[in-house]
């Protein structure tokens, strides 16, 4: 079953690192997807699910950094699969080992306890440009390496694919690939500045101007705004 763009999109930042977590569904009372459950968001996710009578069909991860995946196991709760690109799958084994020591120390100081990681039980590995139908939502996986090897964006089309003239993307969950006025870092382990440039040129810039961008950090934006004002997109060409 393929639906039009979702009508229920709830986003909120985690207390740590202000990582945006999103809950997306076609409507209240239906299945949903949870995107990037970061540090300490599990209770907030449960509240959203209860308030809107939602049932999680999948947990989608834009990449494997700790601030985007830390609550994936409690949110999945042994009943829901976590989806991550195959190139970032190794990070779910122990994301604590793939981050800067300073980031880990900052997190432990903020929460006053040692970070503990549990790998999710059911993990589905994604490929680039893969199509998914989860919670009745048509999703496209856009592989956009640079911030990490397996960074992806999740695109939701405005109308179902297969309809004439329907290859228009209305909403993109951009993770740490694209922010309002900026892009994700490439100096962390697994980052690659050249790969990021290629992703921006070949994956991000072709998105239609009307695309709503829901980033991993900071406010929502549009491709029209970013194309005109984001300094990291200037000079790359369409």
Predicted segment positions?
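Conserved S/T- and glycine-rich ATP-binding loop of Class I adenylate-forming
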Residues: 24, 62, 144
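Metallo-beta-lactamase
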Residues: 30, 40, 98-102, 137-237
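Active-site HxH/HxHxD metal-binding segment of metal-dependent hydrolases
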Residues: 39-43, 47-133, 159-162, 228-236
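Hydrophobic residues in well-ordered beta-strands that form the structural core
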Residues: 35, 83-84, 174, 215
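Short Pro/Gly-enriched beta-strand edge/turn motifs at strand-loop
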Residues: 2-8, 110-114, 135-139
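Short Gly/Pro-enriched turn/cap motifs at secondary-structure boundaries
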Residues: 12-14, 121-123, 143-145
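Short acidic/glycine-enriched loop/turn segments that link adjacent beta-strands
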Residues: 16-18, 126, 148-150
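Conserved beta-strand hairpin/beta-sheet module of binuclear metal-dependent hydrolase folds
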Residues: 2-52, 154-166, 170-173
């Amino acid at each position: 079953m393929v639906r039009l763009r979702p009508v229920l999109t709830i986003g909120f930042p985690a207390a740590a690192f202000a990582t945006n977590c999103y809950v997306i569904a076609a409507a209240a009372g239906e299945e949903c997807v949870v995107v990037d459950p970061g540090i300490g968001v599990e209770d907030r996710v449960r509240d959203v699910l209860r308030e809107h009578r939602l049932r999680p069909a999948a947990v989608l991860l834009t990449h494997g950094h700790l601030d985007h995946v830390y609550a994936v196991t409690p949110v999945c709760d042994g009943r829901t699969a976590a989806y991550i690109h195959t190139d970032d799958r190794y990070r779910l084994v122990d994301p604590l080992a793939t981050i800067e020591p300073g980031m880990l120390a900052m997190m432990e100081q903020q929460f006053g306890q040692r970070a503990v990681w549990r790998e999710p039980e059911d993990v589905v590995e994604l490929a680039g440009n893969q199509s998914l139908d989860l919670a009745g939502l048509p999703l496209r996986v856009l592989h956009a390496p640079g911030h990490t090897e397996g960074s992806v964006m999740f695109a939701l089309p405005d109308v179902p694919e297969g309809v004439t003239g329907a290859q228009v993307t209305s909403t993109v969950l951009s993770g740490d690939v694209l922010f309002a006025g900026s892009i994700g870092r490439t100096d962390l382990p697994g980052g690659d500045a050249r790969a990021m440039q290629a992703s921006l040129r070949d994956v991000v810039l072709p998105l239609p101007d009307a695309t709503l961008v829901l980033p991993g950090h900071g406010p929502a934006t549009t491709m029209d705004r970013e194309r005109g004002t984001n300094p990291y997109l200037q000079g790359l060409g369409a």
